[in-house]
Amino acid sequence: MSTRLGDLVERLGGRLIGDADIEVVGIAPLGDADASHITFLSNPKLRGQAAQTRAAALILSAADDEIVAANYQGARIVADNPYAYFARAAQLFAALHAYVAPAGIHPTASVDPQAKVAASASIGPHVTVEAGAIIENACVIDAGCFIGRNARIGAATHFYPRVTFLAGCSIGQRGIVHPGAVIGADGFGFANEGGAWIKIPQTGAVSIGDDVEIGANTSIDRGALADTVIEDGVKLDNQIQIGHNCHIGAHTAMAGCVGVAGSAVIGKYCTFGGAAMVLGHLTIADRVHISSGSLVSRSIKEPGQYTGFYPLAKNAEWEKSAVIVRNLAAMREKIREMEKTIKSLGDEQE
C-alpha cells in the first residue's frame, strides 16, 4: 500500500519541495532506498551519501537542504527535526502495512466470566484472564499472556506473547509490552531476624501510565504497601529490573539491563545508558542523563550528564579524573625521578 508525498506532509507537517503526487510505499536507509521509498538525513556526516541516494524523497533539515539540494534531484521534505519526522513517518507506514488482529476471544483462551473484555479487543490463543480484569477497546493480547485478578489494560494497548500481568496492576492507553515481560511479581522485601529472613507481603501493585513501552523480559515489581509507579511516556528496553515502590517520571528512557533498586524516585525526561545501576531509596532530579555502566550511589539534585562507576560525578569532572587515572603510572615514575634528584641534591650539599 502506497501513500502520496503530499498526503504525508499534510499529515505530518514539514515543507515539501517537489512533486506532491509521488507515491511511496515505505522508508529505507540512504544507501538502500529506491524510487518507491523516502529516506532521511539526520547526521551531517552523511550529506555525501544523501546526495547520491535513489530515494523518491529525502527528509532533511533546512541547513542540510542548502548543501544537499544542488546534487539531489528527488523531492525534499524540510523538517525542524528530521529524525523525529522519520519516526512519525515510520509509524504511519507501519500502520499501513500492519497485521490487524481479529476482534474476539480465541477458543483456547480462558476468560473468567467476571472479567470484562471489550468487544473490539483481540484475545489470542491460550491467554488467561482472571476474574475482575478489565481489557478495554482495541487491545491486542497475544498468545500465552496471563492477566491477573482485577488487572486493568487501557485502550489500544498491545501485549506481545507470554506477557505476565499480575493481580491489581494497571496500564494506560496505547501501551506496548514485549514478550516475556513480568509486571507485578513480588518485590524483594524481607526483614532480618537473627540471620533468618522474614518475607514482607507485597500488597501494592504496579501502576503504569499512557504510551509506555516495556521491553522483552523486563520485570517491574509490585510495591510493598503502595504501588510501583511508571508515569506516561516511559520507554524501557529489554531485561530491565525495576524494584518495588520505585517511581519513574514521565518520558524517562532506559536502555537494556538497567537495574533500579527499590524505592528509588527518578524524575521526568531522564535517560539511562545500558547496564546503569541505581541504588535504592535515592532521588534523581528531572533531565538527568546517566551514562552506560554507571553506578548511581547517591541522590542527584541537578540536571546534567553523569558518568562513572565510583564515585559518580558530573560527566565533565569524570572525564578529567579519568585522564588523571590513566596517567597515574607515568606520574609515579616522574615523582620517583624527582625524589631521586632532590635526594642527590641534598647529598651534594652535605
Swiss-Prot record:
Its EC number is 2.3.1.191. It holds the Pfam family LpxD. GO terms for cellular component: membrane. Keywords: Acyltransferase, Lipid A biosynthesis, Lipid biosynthesis, Lipid metabolism, Repeat, Transferase. CDD domains: LbH_LpxD. Pathway: Bacterial outer membrane biogenesis; LPS lipid A biosynthesis. One of its GO terms (biological process) is lipid A biosynthetic process. It comes from the Bacteria. Transmembrane segments: none annotated. InterPro entries: LpxD, Trimer_LpxA-like_sf, UDP_GlcNAc_AcTrfase_non-rep. GO terms for molecular function: N-acyltransferase activity. It catalyses: a UDP-3-O-[(3R)-3-hydroxyacyl]-alpha-D-glucosamine + a (3R)-hydroxyacyl-[ACP] = a UDP-2-N,3-O-bis[(3R)-3-hydroxyacyl]-alpha-D-glucosamine + holo-[ACP] + H(+). The active site is at H244 (proton acceptor). Catalyzes the N-acylation of UDP-3-O-acylglucosamine using 3-hydroxyacyl-ACP as the acyl donor. Is involved in the biosynthesis of lipid A, a phosphorylated glycolipid that anchors the lipopolysaccharide to the outer membrane of the cell. HAMAP family: LpxD. Homotrimer. Belongs to the transferase hexapeptide repeat family. LpxD subfamily. This is UDP-3-O-acylglucosamine N-acyltransferase.
